[in-house]
Amino acid sequence: MHAGLPTMTTPQDIIRRDVLAMTSYPVPDASGFVKLDAMENPYPLPEPLAAALGERLARVALNRYPAPRPAALLDKLRHAMGVPGTCDVLLGNGSDEIISMISVACAKPGAKVLAPVPGFVMYELSARFAQLDFVGVPLKADLTLDVDAMLAAIAEHRPAIVYLAYPNNPTGTLYDDADIERILRAATHSLIVIDEAYQPFAQHSWLPRAGEFDNVVVMRTVSKLGLAGIRLGYLVGRPAWLNEFDKVRPPYNINVLTQATADFLLDHLDVLDAQAAELRAERARLAQAVAALPGATVFPSAGNFLLVRVPDAAAVFDALLTERVLVKNVSKMHPLLAECVRLTVGSPDENARLLAALKLALPD
């Protein structure tokens, strides 16, 4: 350093200490693997539909900013998804952005976020980013909702936000409707966010009832339906809530290509629904086959994935990697997930390769 020059500022001088202590969200390189780690729909669009979409996208004005609230798309979404008349719709760049908007808008000093654990990691991460306290309420040993513990935690902590994933990720659990209603009735001082990211595979929904409760919003994404690449989530709830969240939404958060793709494919939901039906059938076949393997315990799932407990999760994960099959080792995420791996339900060919690899990893 030259004499007389001031000491330069470093990131450590400026960045929050809790951020410095974090690590980036890990996303493994899946090149050359059968990719069964991220709950994606394995099916591409049929070729004629993909070609028609390509022609539509070629006409999009890339030189113009996107509409901040695309009225035609929102109306089409309301109609296609059966949004109650008393509710509005807010779009996000994936449900992750919606979670972030909710966290930022509700980040009063001392406010808390509460959710069952293990659950979707972004509930806690987004809370931490917004400097909200996160309270995790463990599921029961069978990975069902501990409703009494939830009610006690709500009474103790009076959280600003309560997340209920319906069904839950990574467990696949579809919480009992009566238990959810007990939580809704008890958490009168909280915003309840019902996360229905996997609704196409659960075939159960609280969205039709979103307008019945003053403090309930329902969140969905098109990712699991087969459109993970366009990053589009939406929130349904009373305008009084959504108008406030809209204030912290980046003004051009949904790009023109995403808007055009969603508008086009909402006219072809029958294709995506048929793919979801095929994946539900594959889920049943895969669950039965995996459960027959030595040492494997398959938990009931209402998502497009299976949570499986094996004798040694790390060894199974590595053995599958050797066979060029990528799954998710969730065994370190929470004590209730000890020795568990999460398997995305793929196409019949992908599932056959997964089963062949699992048979090598779990010999008799």
Swiss-Prot record:
Homodimer. This is Histidinol-phosphate aminotransferase. HAMAP family: HisC_aminotrans_2 (MF_01023). Gene3D superfamilies: Aspartate Aminotransferase, domain 1, Type I PLP-dependent aspartate aminotransferase-like (Major domain). NCBIfam families: hisC (TIGR01141). One of its GO terms (molecular function) is histidinol-phosphate transaminase activity. InterPro entries: Aminotransferase_I/II_large, HisP_aminotrans, PyrdxlP-dep_Trfase, PyrdxlP-dep_Trfase_major, PyrdxlP-dep_Trfase_small. The gene is hisC. Pathway: Amino-acid biosynthesis; L-histidine biosynthesis; L-histidine from 5-phospho-alpha-D-ribose 1-diphosphate: step 7/9. It comes from the Bacteria. The keyword Transferase applies. One of its GO terms (biological process) is L-histidine biosynthetic process. The modification N6-(pyridoxal phosphate)lysine is found at residue 224. It is an enzyme of class 2 (transferase). Its cofactor is pyridoxal 5'-phosphate. Its EC number is 2.6.1.9. It catalyses: L-histidinol phosphate + 2-oxoglutarate = 3-(imidazol-4-yl)-2-oxopropyl phosphate + L-glutamate. It holds the Pfam family Aminotran_1_2. Belongs to the class-II pyridoxal-phosphate-dependent aminotransferase family. Histidinol-phosphate aminotransferase subfamily. Keywords: Amino-acid biosynthesis, Aminotransferase, Histidine biosynthesis, Pyridoxal phosphate, Transferase. It comes from Burkholderia multivorans (strain ATCC 17616 / 249).
